[in-house]
Amino acid sequence: MGQQQLLLLVLGIVIVGLAVVVGIQAFSENQKKANADSLVNDGIRLASDIQAWSLKPEAFGGPAAGDDLGDADFGSIGVGTGTTGYSNTNGSFEITPGTGCVVITGDNGLTGDKQNLVYISVRGTAQDNIETQINGSAITSCTAE
């Protein structure tokens, strides 16, 4: 082979290598975004289950007299048997009670750049009473509206 052919071969290998690296990085970023979307979807589902639970009469499994959104736990909304946490293939979730509201925290269990943290605040039973925060500052407490 001549020098031009060798140069073209090396250049072609370098270009293919760069394309593979860029493709792997794009896949990793897309995977993180897809996981964050899944965590938000699960968190919104849990939030709407809490809202539905708070609207039920006590006779149908709703809150006892004097209870409110802040008294919700995973057992009361029918997700798992415990009250401390809930896990699925997307991540794990915890409920932090507040005064008439709750904060749901979702974590995919990974560390570093691949970690996703989702915070969902439920402050009432209306659709606009749900607030989400993805990979940002934590919602640590809430107050009912």
Feature-to-residue mapping (PLM):
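Membrane-proximal N-terminal amphipathic helix
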Residues: S28-F60
